[in-house]
UniProtKB/Swiss-Prot annotation:
Keyword presence, Repeat: yes
InterPro entries (UniProt xref): C1-like_sf, DEF8, DEF8_C1, PE/DAG-bd, RH_dom
Keyword GTP-binding: no
Biased amino acid composition, Basic and acidic residues: 25-36
Chain positions covered by the region annotation Disordered: 18-48
Protein name: Differentially expressed in FDCP 8 homolog
Sorted UniProt keywords: Metal-binding, Phosphoprotein, Repeat, Zinc, Zinc-finger
Chain positions with Phosphoserine modification: 440
Family as reported in the entry's similarity comment: Belongs to the DEF8 family.
Record's subunit section: Interacts (via C-terminus) with PLEKHM1; this interaction is weak but increased in a RAB7A-dependent manner.
Source superkingdom: Eukaryota
Length: 451
């Protein structure tokens, strides 16, 4: 009996850790072993009290098989006391002073300084079990109070039951997660990227291959492959990179590169990070279509119409700025959702192009154009007095630079009938008059000296 106990203890201590089917109390029988077989009905002798039991996970740790070799996400600060945070804040201040002014590195250092100060503020308030504000990887999480709305955790991809679980939402990128998942987050807040680098990837699906990613998810670095592993590789059509199923939920989004190059608005599958970035960027006017794809105006008639309406609105803007009635009526606020329309005629957002494609932007902009023109030409006497009379034919109604049948001199901004201007292709009358006036001003002092 003593021999059996020693044999059991020996096999428990030398269990093969790679055999997943055998527990700590089961063993394989050697082929040349003459000992009696232990059936499933037989019970193994109990170990004496006080003897340490070997378990599978402990043996795995001893062999180094359960180690986490992945580095922690960039920006994750693990300081546990106030003194370490204060020291890190002072070092960050020194780095900011040493970096060049207005450089990208200095901006990133300022963001990190804000993050450290907010983290310090959290540690100074230890009384709250679940703080209302949590700052992590540039996310600014607020505790949600809604108990009835059912959401999905962006980290563990499971349902958030607000009635029994505490959860947070980032105010910048609307990232949602359980309170227990906060410290496991590896994705930085994309709102900081939007504020610092407001630009799109304009190459269509710039794929580099799984080998360039070391066969790991581009975000969380989990092992992925096209086949052979539990986590399938899913490609993001915006970045061209591959992600695991936790970071890529097969969300659909319109790809900016396909819009500006192919006028293609079909939604494609993108990762969660790309989806949130595109959602935050959708209304930002960062696309200069004339430089990216000037031929697009030759094939999309609606873009030509929109460009003409925007040019007219820019010509109307000086009338409104100098008109008291227009300022009181706040006419320019009709375009408050598209402030770039009263600043230039070149920049577009993806939201603008989407509405051009659906035919909505042309209708709404034409309506606003009509309201603006009505104020200048009919409703306001001050604005009417700023009109022009064609100096070539001296006939017809008062002209304005945004009228469709007029032409504007590039030098003096005088307005003429289009037919009159092109039929009399000589010098502009107003330009000639201004030239004579300048010559007379230069000659008068000379005449006084001779006299």
């Amino acid at each position: 009996m003593e021999y059996d106990e020693k044999l059991v203890r020996f096999r428990q201590a030398h269990l093969n850790p790679f055999n997943k089917h055998l527990g700590p109390r089961h063993h394989e029988q050697e082929p040349n072993e003459k000992a009696q077989e232990v059936t499933s009905e037989d019970t193994l002798p109990e170990l004496p009290a006080g003897e340490p039991e070997f378990c599978y996970s402990e043996r795995m740790m001893d062999l180094g098989l359960s180690e986490d070799h992945f580095s922690r996400p960039v920006g994750l600060f693990l300081a546990s006391d106030v003194q370490q945070l204060r020291q890190a804040i002072e070092e960050c201040k020194q780095v900011i002073l040493e970096l060049p002014e207005q450089s990208e590195k200095q901006k990133d250092a300022v963001v990190r300084l804000i993050h450290l100060r907010l983290k310090l503020q959290e540690l100074k308030d230890p009384n709250e079990e679940e703080p209302n504000i949590r700052v992590l990887l540039e996310h600014r999480f607020y505790k949600e109070k809604s108990k009835s709305v059912k959401q999905t955790c962006d980290k563990c991809n499971t349902i958030i039951w607000g009635l029994i679980q505490t959860w947070y939402t980032c105010t910048g990128c609307y990232y949602r997660c359980h309170s227990k998942c906060l410290n496991l987050i590896s994705r930085p807040c994309v709102s900081s990227k939007v504020s610092h680098q407001a630009e799109y990837e304009l190459n269509i699906c710039p794929e580099t291959g799984l080998d360039s990613q070391d066969y790991r998810c581009a975000e969380c670095r989990a092992p992925i492959s096209l086949r052979g592993v539990p986590s399938e590789a899913r490609q993001c059509d915006y970045t061209g990179q591959y992600y695991c199923s936790h970071c890529h939920w097969n969300d659909l989004a319109v790809i900016p590169a396909r819009v500006v190059h192919n006028w293609d608005f079909e939604p494609r599958k993108v990762s969660r990070c790309s989806m949130r970035y595109l959602a935050l960027m959708v209304s930002r006017p960062v696309l200069r279509l004339r430089e990216i794809n000037p031929l697009l105006f030759n094939y999309v008639e609606e873009l030509v119409e929109i460009r003409k309406l925007r040019q007219d609105i820019l010509l109307m803007k000086p009338y409104f700025i100098t008109c008291k009635e227009a300022m009181e009526a706040r006419l320019l606020l009709q375009l408050q959702d598209r402030q770039h329309f009263v600043e230039n005629d070149e920049m577009y957002s993806i939201q603008d192009l989407l509405e051009v494609h659906m035919g909505r932007l042309s209708c709404s902009l034409t309506e606003i154009h009509t309201i603006f023109a009505k104020h200048i030409k009919l409703d306001c006497e001050r604005c009417q007095a700023k009109g022009f009379v064609c100096e070539l034919c001296k006939e017809g109604d008062v002209l304005f630079p945004f009228d469709s049948h007029t032409s504007v001199c590039n030098d003096c901004s005088a307005v003429f009938h289009r037919d009159c201007y092109y039929d009399n292709s000589t010098t502009c009358p107003k330009c000639a008059r201004l030239t004579l006036r300048k010559q007379s001003l230069f000659q008068e002092p000379g005449l006084d000296v001779d006299a």
